[in-house]
């Protein structure tokens, strides 16, 4: 599993966890946030490894469907990019203001 997929799933879990059942939340939290293996989760809940795998895959699909319809993560990423752009613009404005002040204060 790639780091990018793990990060995406962590965000989707954060955004859509209220739409998941308690069992789905538990499995996803243990698997993605706490880095449990399928076997460890199966042992914890006294179910088969295959049952855990199937539940996680179904939940991943559900989370992607929620994101497709609601786009909370996509909008979050867009806000983050715009915020970074705004911060750079403010820094440039501060630099320009300082240069103008320096020019005005020259004798």
From Swiss-Prot:
InterPro entries membership: RNA_pol_sigma_r3/r4-like, UPF0122, UPF0122_fam_protein, WH-like_DNA-bd_sf
Signal peptide as annotated in the record: none
Top-level taxon in the UniProt lineage: Bacteria
Entries under SUPFAM superfamilies matching the protein: Sigma3 and sigma4 domains of RNA polymerase sigma factors
UniProt family annotation: Belongs to the UPF0122 family.
HAMAP family, A to Z: UPF0122
Biological function: Might take part in the signal recognition particle (SRP) pathway. This is inferred from the conservation of its genetic proximity to ftsY/ffh. May be a regulatory protein.
Protein name, UniProt field: UPF0122 protein EAT1b_2891
Annotated source species: Exiguobacterium sp. (strain ATCC BAA-1283 / AT1b)
Lineage of producing organism: Bacteria, Bacillati, Bacillota, Bacilli, Bacillales
């Amino acid at each position: 599993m790639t780091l990018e997929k793990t990060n995406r799933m962590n965000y989707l879990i954060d955004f859509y966890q209220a739409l998941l059942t308690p069992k789905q939340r538990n499995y996803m939290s243990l698997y993605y946030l706490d880095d449990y293996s399928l076997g460890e989760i199966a042992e914890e809940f006294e179910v088969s490894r295959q049952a855990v795998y199937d539940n996680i895959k179904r939940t991943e699909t559900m989370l992607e469907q929620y994101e497709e319809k609601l786009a909370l993560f996509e909008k979050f990423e867009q806000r983050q990019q715009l915020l970074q752009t705004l911060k750079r613009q403010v820094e440039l404005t501060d630099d320009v203001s300082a240069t103008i002040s320096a020019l005005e204060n020259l004798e």
